[in-house]
Amino acid sequence: INPGAILLRAAWMYDFPGDRLPIRGNLPLNLLSAAKTGTALHFSEHDFRGVSYVREVIDKLIPAMELPGGVYNFGSGNDCDMFETVSRFARLLGVEVPLEKDHWERNLAMSGEKLKDFGIQFDSTIQAFQQCLDDYGFGHF
C-alpha cells in the first residue's frame, strides 16, 4: 500500500445535459422525468447521503491532488434525509412530483471536516443544487 495514495470517496453526482456529453439518470433528471410522466418516486426518511454537483467536484479535483495521502470524503454534505432532499430539489425545480415514502435505512452521509483542514470545502447538497440552477440560467423558480 502506498502511504501517499489519495482516495476520494465520492457522493452521488448530478448535472444537466450540455456540451454534447451523455448524461445518465441522476436526481434532477429523474425528478423532471417523474414530473412529466406522473411516475411516483420512492425515497426513505431513513436514507442519509450527500448529493454533489459534478462541476463543483471537478473544480476541487486539482486542489485535492495536493492532499497528503489518505482517505477523504469528497462531495457535498447533507443535513436532510433523502425524502426531504428530493422534496427540496423538486421545489427548486418548480415541479410537482408524486413522492412516496419508503422505510428502508441507509446511511452514506459524509463529513467534509477532514477536507476543510486542507482548505477544500463543498457547498451543502441544497446550496450546490441552487448553484447548478444558477449556472444553467434557471435561477430561482
Predicted regions and their residues:
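Residues at secondary-structure transition points
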Residues: 22, 26, 52, 105-106, ...
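NAD(P)-dependent short-chain dehydrogenase/reductase
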Residues: 1-49, 56
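Hydrophobic/aromatic beta-strand patches that form the interior of the parallel beta-sheet core
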Residues: 6-8, 72, 123
